[in-house]
Amino acid sequence: MFLIQEIIRKKRDGKTLSEEEIRFFINGIRDNTVSEGQIAALAMTIYFHDMSMDERVALTLAMRDSGTVLNWKSLNLNGPLVDKHSTGGVGDVTSLMLGPMVAACGGYVPMISGRGLGHTGGTLDKLEAIPGLDIFPNDDHFRRIIQQVGVAIIGQTSSLAPADKRFYATRDITATVDSIPLITASILAKKLAEGLDALVMDVKVGSGAFMPTYELSEQLAQAIVGVANNAGCRTSALLTDMNQVLASSAGNALEVREAVRFLTGESRNPRLYDVTMALCGEMLLAGGLASSADDAHSRLQAVLDNGKAADVFGRMVAAQRGPGDFVEHYDRYLPVATLSKPVFATREGVVTAMDTRALGMAVVSLGGGRRQASDTIDYSVGLDSMISLGERVDAQRPLAVIHANTEAQWQQAANEVRAAIQLGDTAPEKTPMVYRRVSAEA
């Protein structure tokens, strides 16, 4: 038995907390025996004093164990349980292709996703643009979909890492969100509760990234990889570019449309293709489903070319109570905004830089995202036909096409898009889509 204030005092004085002390505190968050003030105090001491690797692992596992940890043994699955987590960005629709692609290659992907907040889109919001789709199936239904289809993308239920929900809500109002040990534990508690064999992290870098600098993104990737591997889950991370919108579109229904077109081969944005293939390749390697990066690439290309990945996506949508013919007739089902017209730059030039965060907020202004967690979303609005860095804009080539439901919304978004995109005379130096790989070995 410990005194909560003594645990806080110990960390306040820069000492190392034991696994038992951390677990006692986290269980107190779950059981409501720890007050919001005490959570805030510990969060601030961790913010200033950091945590050792042992403390970070103990915090992550205590938060994971505060609720249900999924166990798949009884299903006798004939492949690895693998997942991916992204730190979030704009036009980051990779999950919708990646899950089916990996499942088509023999993996099982029990993906528990989140909603969008601020400039970053949420995978759950994208899926909810599909009429009837159930993102909260019960446990038996979730397990059945994984067993029969190989992938399901669902929301976090109250039984998964419940201590994290309360801890995060307090961090959010006490300026302690951006603490690497706390971010690491928050992300991994939920992911490790999925009962995974392997995890791949997509840590974004650039003007639309969660972390403001490359160095901080790198630190976060290293922290997550270190803690997850020490907690018993084989994990690697890719640092990927978010200095421009990743896909050709940003907005819920628009991104779902792009995902289906990607899977069927109708249209594939090269940047989105590079990042999706890199992440899927990591997942196949981590799960022992490919012998090398080249082998992974050819297996993934095969399931795109032969239609297996698109078929798995369609089966997942149907299994989650969406339309049975969604892949064939997505345009029949996805909501469409009443107004769709291009926004042009005020002068000709080459795109030299983008404020990707501001472009994400333009989607929020249209009603396609949330400023607060309680906001409702208009799934039909957003941007598509996005210009890319290095491309020339003129009277023929717009910056984007804006999908809005009122002229006033369109006008506001047009102003925000113009302000977010810088023009010059020469193209910027091309940056890689994947900056580096972080693994336990390196």
UniProtKB/Swiss-Prot annotation:
One of its GO terms (cellular component) is cytosol. Keywords: Glycosyltransferase, Transferase. Pathway: Pyrimidine metabolism; dTMP biosynthesis via salvage pathway; dTMP from thymine: step 1/2. GO terms for molecular function: 1,4-alpha-oligoglucan phosphorylase activity; thymidine phosphorylase activity. The keyword Lipid metabolism does not apply. It comes from the Bacteria. Its EC number is 2.4.2.4. It is an enzyme of class 2 (transferase). The enzymes which catalyze the reversible phosphorolysis of pyrimidine nucleosides are involved in the degradation of these compounds and in their utilization as carbon and energy sources, or in the rescue of pyrimidine bases for nucleotide synthesis. Belongs to the thymidine/pyrimidine-nucleoside phosphorylase family. HAMAP family: Thymid_phosp. This is Thymidine phosphorylase. It comes from Pectobacterium atrosepticum (strain SCRI 1043 / ATCC BAA-672).
